[in-house]
C-alpha cells in the first residue's frame, strides 16, 4: 500500500484544532513534533523512551504529521484539507507561518514514524497517560490511562486536555455521573472512570471519534462504565441530574450550549469547559453566567483557559 504524509507547520495553540481536522478527513495516525517536549524537564522514571535528538524537532512552532492511505479520493481532497486548515484562522486560532506539505511514504515508515514522538505524559501527581505499546510500571496509587494515538487525536499532550484532567481530578467524586461532550479519543471519559465516576456518557458528532473512543475505552477496561453515543453536543440528552459535564472543544462551540449544560446539571453540579483560547475566555465566561452558571475558577496553561462553573444549589 502507498501512504501519504501531510505535514503542517503551525503554532502550539493550533495543535488540537489542526489535528482534529486531519482526523476528521480520515487520517490513520497523527504525530506532534514540539520542541517543548524535548526541552522540558522530565522525571527519571520515564527513562530511555526519551532518547531523542534535538534535530528531531522544529526550531519554532509545532509540526503535525498525519498519515493517509494514498487513494484517488484523498488526492482529490488535498486542496480541501489545506483550505479547511487555513480557515481555522477565522476562529481566531493563530496558525503562525503555516506550511502545508504532502509527501509519499512507504507502509513501514508511516506505521512507526509517529510513535517516537508520543511518550508517557504525567498530567498530575497521580494520573499518567501511557502509549498502549509502552511497558510502564506505575508508582503506588498512580492512575494509568492507556491510549493509542493512531486512532484519534486526544493524547493528553495538549494543554486543553491537561487542564480538563486536572479539573476532573479536583472536582470529581466517587459515584458521580458525568457527560463528556466532544469526547474525541475518549481520554476524559477514561480519566473520569478511573477517578471513580459511576457512569459516563461520551458524545461526539464525528463517527471516527466515537469509534476511536470505543477502542480506547475497551483498551482501558472501562466499557462497563462509559457509554459512547454519536450526538451533536447535548441535543436530545434528556438528563437533569448530572454531577459533571466536561467539554474540551473550541470556545465558539461552547457558546452554543450553556443553557443545555445548566439543564443537564443537578443543583451544585460542575461544568468544566476547556479548549478556550485566552482571547475568548471573557465571552465564554459571560455566556456561562447568562445561562445561570456560577464561575468557580479559571485555570490557564500557556494561551489556553479552562473555566470551571457550577449550577447553584436551589
From Swiss-Prot:
A Pfam family it matches: PrmA
Chief location of this protein within or outside the cell: cytoplasm
Cellular compartment(s): Cytoplasm
Keyword hit for Hydrolase: no
Cross-referenced SUPFAM superfamilies: S-adenosyl-L-methionine-dependent methyltransferases (SSF53335)
GO molecular function list: protein-lysine N-methyltransferase activity
PANTHER family associated with the record: ELECTRON TRANSFER FLAVOPROTEIN BETA SUBUNIT LYSINE METHYLTRANSFERASE (PTHR43648:SF1)
The protein's name in its UniProt record: Ribosomal protein L11 methyltransferase
Source organism of this protein record: Listeria monocytogenes serotype 4b (strain F2365)
Biological classification of the source: Bacteria, Bacillati, Bacillota, Bacilli, Bacillales
